[in-house]
Amino acid sequence: MRFTRLSLSNFKCYADAAVSLDPGVTVIHGLNGSGKSSLLDACFFALYGTTALDTTLADAVTIGAETAEIDLHFEHAGGDYHVHRRIRASGGRAQTAACVLETPTDRIDGVTDVEAHISGLLRMDAEAFVNCAYVRQGEVNKLINAAPSTRQDMIDALLQLGKLEEYRQRAGDARLGVEDVKSNVEGQLDRLADQIADKEAADPHDRLASHNTALAEVTADIEHFEAEREQARQTRDDAADVLERYEESRTALADVEETIADVREAVAEAERERETLADRVSDHRERASDLDDEAAALAADLGLDDPDAEDASAERDAVADQREAVAERVREVAPAVSRLTEQADSAADDAATLDERAETLREEAAALDAEADDAAAKRDDAAARIEALDADIEAAMAAFDDAPVAFGAAEAFLDDATAERDELRERVATLRADRQSAADRVAEAEALLDEGKCPECGQPVEGAPHVERVTDDRERVAELDAELADVEDELDAVAQRVDRGESLVAAEDRVDDLEQQRERAVERRDEQADIADAKRDQAAEKRDRAADLDAEAEDARADAAAKRDAADEKRETLAALNADQTALKERLDALADLVDRLEAAADAREAAQRLAEKRAALAAQNEQRRDRLSELRERKRTLDSEFDADRIETARADKDRAEDYLEQVEPKLQALREDRDDLQAKIGAAENAIAELESLREEHERVQSRHQDLQAVHDEVTALETMYGELRAELRQQNVSKLERLLNETFELVYQNDSYARIELSGEYELTVYQKDGEPLEPAQLSGGERALFNLSLRTAVYRLLAEGIEGDAPLPPLILDEPTVFLDSGHVSQLVELVESMRRLGVEQIVVVSHDDELVAAADDVVRVAKDATSNRSRVSTPEHI
C-alpha cells in the first residue's frame, strides 16, 4: 500500500492544500510549527476517523470555518482507493457530515462501514497502525519504554495472535458456561427424583377408587330427593292457579259494580249540560237582533239601502282603493318637492365651492413660480461645481505622468510588489534560521575541538573520521551571510516599489472619487433644470383651470334659482291631495264599523244553531248509556253465581303442605351437593397427582439425556481451549525468534559500533542488549540517541516481520516517521539516514519522513516543503521536488 495524493480544505492550519506522494522516500521539510505533522494527521484521520485525533473533532476544523474536507487517494494490492471525509462545525461542536470510501469495485458510505472496511483491508486498526507503521512525534521510544506485557500485547495484536487469545478466552468462557448449566441440570435431576418419591408414597391410585365409590352413592340420593321436590312444586302450582282464578273473579265483579256507578253519573251530568245549552242559545239570538238594529242606523248615515255584509265589504274595498290612489299621488309629489329643494341647495353650495377652488388654484400658481426660480438658481450652482471638479481631476491625473504604470494598473503593480516583498521576507527568515543552525553547529564543534573531541561522535580527535566537517560548516555560515545580504538588498528595493505602488493606488482612488462627485453634480444640474421647467408649466395650467371654475360657478347659481321655482309649484299640488285623503279616510272607517256589526250578527246566529245541535246529540248519548246499564246489571248476576267456597279452602290446604315440604327438602339437597362437590374435587386431585407423577418421570428422563449431552459439549470445549492456548504459544515463539533475528540485523546495519554484540528478545518480549564483553544492559541504560535508534530498529523489525508475514507477504501501509530526529544529535542523524536507506533497499515501497533537519533531505527521493504565513497563520505546501 502507498499514499498517492492528499487534498485538504480548512483542516487545522491549512486553508487549501494538495500534495502528491510518489513511491520511495519522501521528506516533508519545514520549520518547527509550520504544519508538517498536520499532513500526517490528515492521512491518519482519513483512514481511521476521530480515533486518530489527539484533540476533539471541532479542533480539526480551521478557526473561523464551518466545514473541513479531507481527500486521501492510495493504492493497495494493485487497486486505487479514495477516502473522502467532510466535517461540519457549528457553535463549538462538530460532526462528520460525509464519509465515503471508493474502492475499485464498490462505494461505501458511513463512518462505521468505511473504518471497518479499511481496518479489514490493512488488517490493523488505528492502534495497530500507530504501533507498526506510524512513528508519531514524541513516541519514538514508545515500544522500548513499554512494559514487557504491554509490548507483548502490542506485537501480538499486530501479528493477529490476539485473535487466538480471544478465541481461547471465548472457549474458556464457553466451558465455564457449560459447567454452570451442567451444575444446574444435576441439581434439577436431584429435585425431580425427590418429587417422584414423594408422589409415589401418597398412593394416588387407591385414593381415586375409594372416592369414585362414595360419589356414586351421593349422586343416587340427590336424584331421589330432586324427584320428590318436583312433585311438590307441581301440587303447589296447581293450587295457586285455582286461588288466582278466584281472585280474578272477585276483581271482575268489583269492576262491574264500579262501571254501573260511573254510567249513572254520566247520564245525570249530560242532563245538566243540556239545560245550560238551552240558556246559551237564547242569549246568542238576542245579541244578533241588537247588532242588526245598529247596522241599519250606520247604513242610513252612509246612504246605503239595507245592505248585507257582502255589499258593505265591497263598498269598503272601493273606498280603500280610492284612498290608496290619492296616497300614491301624495308619495309621488312629496319626494319631488324635497328633491327639487335639495337640488337648489346643492347647486348653491357647488357655486360657492367652485369659487373657493378657483382662488386656491391662483394661489398655488404663484407658489409654483417661486419654486421654479429657486430650481433655476440651484442649476447654476451645479454648473459651477462641475467646472471646479474637472480642474481637480486633471490635477490628480498628473501623478501618472512619470509613473512606471498607466492609470488603472496601479493596484496590480502594488499586488506584484507586495507578493515579491513577502516572498523575500520569508526567504530572509529561512536563511537566518539556516545560518543560525549552521553557526550553532560550528560553535558546538569548536567547543568540542577545544576539548580534543570529535564534533560528530564525541570520541577523541585521534582517528576521528569527521573532523573536516567543521570547516564545511564554517564555509556554509559565510555563504549564508553573503546570500542573506544580497536578499536583504533586494528586499529594500522591493519595499520602495511597494511605497510607490501605494501612492499610485491612492491617486487612482482620488480620481475615482472626484469623477463620482462630478457625475452627481451633472445629475443635480439636469435635475434642477427639469424641475424649473415643470414648475412653470404647472403654474400656467392652474391659472387656466381657475378661469374655467369661475364660469362653472355662475352656471350653478342660475340652476339653483330654477329649482326653487319648481319646488313651490309642487307644494300647492300636495296640499290639495292631503285634503282628499282625509275625507276618504273618514268614510272608510264608517264602512269598516258597518261590516263588523253585520258579520257579528251572522256569527251570533250561527253559534245559536251549533249549540242547539249539540243539545240534541247529548239526548241521544243518554239513551245509549241507559242500554249499557241493563247489560252491566246482567253481568253482575252471572259473576255472583260462579263463587264456590269449598273448592277454595281445599286449594289453600294443598298449597300450604307443598310449600312446607319444599322448605324442608332444599337444605338436604344442598348438603348432598356439597358432599358430591367435595368428592369430585378429591377425585380431580387424585387424577392430577397421577398425571404429575407421570410428567415427573418423563421430565427426569429428558433432563438425564440433556445432562449427558452437556457432558459431551464440556469435553469438546475444554479440548478447544487447550488447542488455542498451545497454538498461540507456538506461534508466539516462532515470531519471537524471527523478530529477534530481524532486530539484530537492523540494529547492526544502522549502528556500526564495536560496543554492542547483540540484542536478545525473550518469549515474554523482554529486551536485553549485550555488549562486546558479554555484559547485559537494559535498553534504558543506553544513551538518548542510542535508545532512539534502538527503538527505531525495533519498530522497523516489527514492520519487516509484518511485511514478510507468517505465511508470506502481507500488504502494509507506508512507513511513516514523524520528527524521528527529536532525540538525536548530528552523528545519530546520519545513522537514521542509514536506517531509512536500508528500509528502502529492503523493498519498502513508500517511506514518509517529517523533519526540519536538512541532512535527511539528502536521503530523500522527493521533498515536500511546508511553510506558514506569519500574517494569516495558515500553512501552505509546495509542489514536491524530485532530488
From Swiss-Prot:
GO terms classed as biological process: DNA repair; double-strand break repair
Physiological role: Part of the Rad50/Mre11 complex, which is involved in the early steps of DNA double-strand break (DSB) repair. Rad50 controls the balance between DNA end bridging and DNA resection via ATP-dependent structural rearrangements of the Rad50/Mre11 complex.
Deleted gene: phenotype: Mutants show a slight growth defect, but do not show increased sensitivity to ionizing radiation or alkylating agents. Show decreased rates of survival after UV-C irradiation.
Coiled coil, from the record: 244-283, 336-389, 414-452, 571-604, 668-720
Residues annotated to bind ATP: 12, 32-38, 137
Family label: Belongs to the SMC family. RAD50 subfamily.
Domain statement: The two conserved Cys that bind zinc constitute the zinc-hook, which separates the large intramolecular coiled coil regions. The 2 Cys residues coordinate one molecule of zinc with the help of the 2 Cys residues of the zinc-hook of another Rad50 molecule, thereby forming a V-shaped homodimer.
Record-linked InterPro entries: DSB_repair_ATPase (IPR053480), P-loop_NTPase (IPR027417), Rad50/SbcC_AAA (IPR038729), Rad50_ATPase_archaeal (IPR022982), Zn_hook_RAD50 (IPR013134)
Cellular-component GO terms for this entry: DNA repair complex
Biased composition (Basic and acidic residues): 313-326
Binding residues annotated for Zn(2+), in chain numbering: 454, 457
Summary of subunit composition and partner proteins: Homodimer. Forms a heterotetramer composed of two Mre11 subunits and two Rad50 subunits.
Cofactor note: Binds 1 zinc ion per homodimer.
Protein name: DNA double-strand break repair Rad50 ATPase
Stored Pfam families: AAA_23
Species this protein is from: Halobacterium salinarum (strain ATCC 700922 / JCM 11081 / NRC-1)
Keyword ATP-binding tagged: yes
Gene expressing this chain: rad50
Disordered as annotated region, ranges: 271-290, 305-326, 508-565
